[in-house]
């Protein structure tokens, strides 16, 4: 498979290493220096850039009929527009706040526990998230997914609040 990588930081380089080891070919590596480069010749694009660049990269891939896998978070407030474009273009887009199998199992357990918490109004959910200082998006898509799932599964909650303590420590609580 021929892959276009949008975002060539730590994650992009890790994806490239695994892809090449499995016999795939990386035909494009997009960084800030060559932003806006079309995914010509790619079978699929993998998007792990920054929230401000992700939407432009998704648009570019959809405009060139290249399916795109998106791991970048921080753009979900524009989800309706992205869904519309995918539908209008009859394109393909797969996104997740976290692609780790372990974290997705954790998401499932979180939803189960949120359902159990619904019977315990004397308890409240609270999420503290701490990352390394190089984390580009905070709070992470993972923390937002956890909070959203608790909100959806538990009566009595009507959303969640983001509290920023500092750049490396983000709190999501209710």
Where are these regions (language model features)?
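C-terminal substrate-binding/catalytic lobe of Rossmann-fold NAD(P)-dependent oxidoreductases
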Residues: 2, 10-39, 121-174
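Hydrophobic beta-strand scaffold residues
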Residues: 26, 68-69, 92-93
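Short, ordered loop/turn segments at secondary-structure junctions
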Residues: 32, 73-75, 98-99, 130-132
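Beta-loop-alpha module in the N-terminal Rossmann-like domain of NAD(P)-dependent dehydrogenases
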Residues: 37-61, 74-79
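Rossmann-fold NAD(P)-binding glycine/threonine-rich loop
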Residues: 59, 63, 72-95, 101-115
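Active-site-proximal catalytic alpha-helix in oxidoreductases
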Residues: 101-117, 135-148
């Amino acid at each position: 498979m021929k892959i276009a990588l949008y975002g060539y930081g730590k994650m992009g380089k890790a994806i490239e290493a695994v892809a090449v080891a499995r016999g795939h070919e990386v035909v494009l590596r997009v960084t800030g220096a060559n932003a806006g480069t079309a995914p010509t010749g790619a079978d699929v694009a993998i998007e792990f850039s920054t929230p401000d660049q992700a939407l432009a990269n998704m648009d570019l891939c959809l405009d060139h009929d290249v399916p795109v896998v998106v791991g970048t978070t921080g753009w979900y407030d524009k989800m309706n527009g992205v869904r519309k474009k995918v539908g209008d273009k009859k394109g393909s887009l797969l996104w997740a706040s976290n692609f780790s199998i372990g974290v997705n199992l954790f998401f499932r357990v979180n939803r189960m526990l949120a359902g159990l918490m619904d019977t315990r109004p004397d308890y409240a959910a609270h999420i503290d998230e701490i990352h390394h200082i190089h984390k580009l998006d905070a709070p992470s898509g993972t923390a937002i997914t956890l909070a959203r799932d608790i909100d959806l599964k538990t009566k009595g909650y009507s959303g969640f609040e983001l509290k920023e303590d500092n750049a490396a420590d983000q709190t999501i609580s209710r």
